[in-house]
């Protein structure tokens, strides 16, 4: 049941970052106080988000299973970050986006973030969950019942 997606999650991430930049300039509503601490917090969240996504992708590579959604999974990864969330790569992307929003410094820049999360759930996570259940059966169901989708 391999499905080919024309747009992969990192492309949605880049599109969301572009939308955030546009919203920041077009809808500069509720500007945050521009102090270095807000910027530092945003940069820290970006670094944490990238780290989460990279560590999670590394777990896939070490297990010999593809990172690209809907390619045939060869291993069910349940260790490391996957003990806490079933979707650490997507969670890392959301943390990165929240950090970017803090760095931009306006509520307007954060408006696309929930849309990104909704698109990821709708276009990827739901299908991936069904796909993994077909491949791994009860093993995946036990994992799914034990570990939350996000945190």
Predicted features by range, described:
Residues 1-79, 91-151:
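Membrane-anchoring alpha-helices and their flanking helix-loop junctions
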Residues 82:
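Solvent-exposed interhelical
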Residues 87:
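Extended, alpha-helix-rich binding/interface surfaces that flank or overlap catalytic cores
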